[in-house]
Amino acid sequence: MNSRYVGYICCALAMIGVGSTVVVSKSIAAGLPPFSATALRFAIAFPLFVLVMRWRGVRWPRLDRRDTALVIAQAAAGSVGYTVLLISGMKLASAGDAGVIAGTLPAVSAMVAMLALGERPSPALLGAIVLATAGVLACTVYAGDNAAPHAGGSIVGNLLVFAAIVCEALFILLNRKLRTPVAPLPLSASMCGIGFAVSIVPACFEQAWNMPIDAAALGGVLYYALVPTVAGFVLWYEGAARVSGAEAGLMTALVPVSALALAALLLREPVSAAQLTGVACVLGAVMLATFGQSLGARKMA
């Protein structure tokens, strides 16, 4: 098979795995406290990343104090903050809404960079931010009839999921501030190791061991650690090495689409017109953000 097609397949599978996290987080939220689930996820994923590092002969990075502090902040925001907020939000939000909101990451990242670093976005990125905002509002404000009895909870849940996406955007922003570039594999391993250290203390206060065992929640955490976290990393970087940055960026459009489809198929959630509108807006935002970055890179070159 052509190397580029293999890259497309790898990137697509990785993004479908990311989309599935909002669905599996629904099961996790029903049976485990958020910090306990987060600590368990990293406890499973960290040794696997270490094994992959040894297999590939990759060493741990040597960082100064400033970069070490930034990496810890990355883990606290992008690893622990993201997972805890996503699981907390899934107690209240529908998986379909959460999937649409998760797809706004490229636009939210551009918005955070604009606000925090004073970057001047291109017209394409501004359009992406507007479309992403419209997509979130479509799911949050114009709730369907099925969501009416829980409208207040749904709005709070959607806001928690959006806060999780902001945490992920902060992770991307902090990574750009590192003086010493860290390769993706040791960075992911570090995020899991530090993430476990950060989340284990609040997890102890949740006393999950006093709760009845929920097989679905434990299975969800195992899936989250193995498939989107470890396998998703391997698939994404294997695929991204075979295609252009713009092509890989476009694959992120599969996150909201796969999340909405899996929510309908596995959780039997009804798909509303507001969610379809939100997906359309988010897909447009992903395309604008991807092509906007591609055009900006060409101009700089």
Protein language model regions, located:
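Structural signature of hydrophobic alpha-helical transmembrane segments
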Residues: P33-P47, S88-P106, S154-V166, A215-T229, ...
